[in-house]
């Protein structure tokens, strides 16, 4: 059975937080913290649990933030990385975001504390309020962290300044000034950690949604001295542009907006579906010659306000040989933490090199 993300902030995480803080601070009210942390937790969703645990921590850590920060900076020395159920990373989330809630009047100390804590989970969410209220100071830290020896800290330099960070607070200065972000990413484009380079790619993908030509131009600059790592970054960074059929991005990656598919058939195996069921998409076509193709499918799904949003999924990418091709893909209407479904018409659209080849509709009942 799949574990919900919110359940990773439950009894085991609360116990870990209490044990570690009690080891650092012998007068920490271990049992009281556990009892208070559990009170009202069950009905809360993931981010609500984070806020609830921060509020509980505030009852037990010093009201004087420098003293609380001194305790938090010692946490990594006592923090185990794994248990039988998996990693303890999520348990550190409330400890990290505590800094964002209580440390905004102490930006220098808070940023130093976040650097210490980010290897436990990630401080990418906690850093956003500091970028919003203390941009110049925080940006200086990002520039320095991009040169840090710890890959978790270097990743924070990139992930923390993503303009469209999922779940992260929006920072207007990042949305309107891609140049300041790119100055950080320039230091990380040849990083030896895939973990860091993937963050660089995701950051550029964010930027491309508002400044596509800026990202394409930067990609050409980076590929002037091509390496396998840079090529992988650019491929991942331009995935949004490829899905949207951006001609320059497609050409740069070796895909053309002119392609020749014959005898195209795109079908769904049902016209109605219930929640938690699966629909199968089938696509068949004939190629007379080998072609470089990016085949995606888009789901146009209704939201709570009645309007539709679009989510694009990868299907098949690469050089396809001449001949008949039969592709199938299953899509589950199972509710997950990051996606909810509403009854009504859902449209599946097949995209080849960013161009629509057809739409099929299914009714969620």
Residue ranges and their predicted role:
Residues 1-249, 274-277, 282, 291:
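Surface-facing alpha-helical segments and adjacent helix-coil boundary elements at the starts of domains
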Residues 248-263:
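Proline/serine/threonine-rich low-complexity linkers at boundaries of modular beta-sandwich domains
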Residues 261-263, 304-316:
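Short beta-strand and strand-turn-strand segments in soluble, beta-rich domains
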Residues 261-267, 271-286:
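Contiguous beta-strand segments within globular domains
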Residues 277-304:
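Beta-strand-rich binding/interaction modules
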Residues 310-336, 364:
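A beta-strand/beta-hairpin structural motif
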Residues 335-345:
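Short glycine/proline/serine/threonine-rich loop/turn segments at secondary-structure transition edges
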Residues 335-337, 351-360:
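Short acidic/polar inter-strand loop motif in beta-rich domains
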